[in-house]
Amino acid sequence: MSASTTATLRHDWTLAEVKALFVQPFNDLLFQAQTVHRAHFDANRVQVSTLLSIKTGACPEDCKYCPQSGHYNTGLEKEKLLEVQKVLEEAARAKAIGSTRFCMGAAWKHPSAKDMPYVLEMVKGVKAMGLETCMTLGRLDQDQTEALAKAGLDYYNHNLDTSPEFYGNIITTRTYSERLQTLAYVRDAGMKICSGGILGMGESLDDRAGLLIQLANLPEHPESVPINMLVKVAGTPLENAEEVDPFDFIRMLAVARILMPQSHVRLSAGREAMNEQMQALAFFAGANSIFYGDKLLTTANPQADKDMQLFARLGIQPEAREEHADEVHQAAIEQALVEQKSSEQFYNAAV
């Protein structure tokens, strides 16, 4: 094996090392990932979160994968920021169906001064229910980050999406360094980080490895690493992107597990398209977190009862809140708003 299964925490991974992990025989890679996983987690427990879109559509960013972008005509109905009481009602529903974390996402480049008081009240209200809280609101400045931390926010999601080299092909309205700066503000404020990326945007193996290197070589590993499979949405520039090979997706999860052994690896956007066998293989590769409920943020997600039925067949138990924590991923939020059920507010992603 090309990396130690003892999985001491490292922050100095090289491209050659990570590519060597990717290209080793599939069974060897999965064995290594499962060995690392068992050294740090109960292999038969998966963390469960629920994700709610608190403000949908009309985002000024031009992310080519995202149906929420105001640059593309995807038929998505725009919505204003939800009222605080509505958010709290949805959080209560999430707790009732077994979620331990409630993740709130807004389609913003960054939160405005007029919206921040409402966002802070949402955090306080959800926290008072005994749920862990997470948000993805776009870029933050230092004052906003500190205000969220003071309100009790546990996790902040801000995805890197892809490698620095490929990033400019996907997004031009926010720089990679701005994303890294937001993550630094979040960490400095004492909150936990959720950050990952998306497969299927035309990136190379070097780009996939490069994304994981960026995450693993941060001063502290993200507590949650969502790995998303592109959900292709009509009207976005990536609607005709080439499909991701399922084995390549599983390899990405396995390498993420090896590089960041103590992080929750979330099986995120795109799970609706995965059959049960692929999801089971994902859990074996080290994925130990999913989003649970009706939807991703704007894309379909397996129904909650189907998730629990699969868990039962695999002998997997939902992770209790006290045991570990994970976080929401923004790519899920940004990743697709295709089958919007008017009667439901939940959006799920999995990782």
Swiss-Prot record:
State the reactions this protein catalyses: (4R,5S)-dethiobiotin + (sulfur carrier)-SH + 2 reduced [2Fe-2S]-[ferredoxin] + 2 S-adenosyl-L-methionine = (sulfur carrier)-H + biotin + 2 5'-deoxyadenosine + 2 L-methionine + 2 oxidized [2Fe-2S]-[ferredoxin]
Q: In which pathway does it act?
A: Cofactor biosynthesis; biotin biosynthesis; biotin from 7,8-diaminononanoate: step 2/2
Record has Iron-sulfur as a keyword:
yes
Which SMART domains does this chain map to? Answer: BATS, Elp3
Provide the Radical SAM core domain boundaries.
Answer: 44-262
> What EC class does the entry list?
transferase
For this entry, list what GO says about its biological process: biotin biosynthetic process
Q: Which cofactor does it need?
A: [4Fe-4S] cluster; [2Fe-2S] cluster
- Molecular functions per Gene Ontology: 2 iron, 2 sulfur cluster binding; 4 iron, 4 sulfur cluster binding; biotin synthase activity; iron ion binding
Asked if the Swiss-Prot or TrEMBL record annotates the protein with the keyword Iron, the reply is: yes
Which residues are recorded as binding [2Fe-2S] cluster? 103, 134, 194, 266
What SUPFAM superfamilies would the database entry show?
A: Radical SAM enzymes
Q: How is the cofactor bound?
A: Binds 1 [4Fe-4S] cluster. The cluster is coordinated with 3 cysteines and an exchangeable S-adenosyl-L-methionine. Binds 1 [2Fe-2S] cluster. The cluster is coordinated with 3 cysteines and 1 arginine.
Query: What is the recorded name of this protein?
Result: Biotin synthase
What is the source species?
Pseudomonas fluorescens (strain ATCC BAA-477 / NRRL B-23932 / Pf-5)
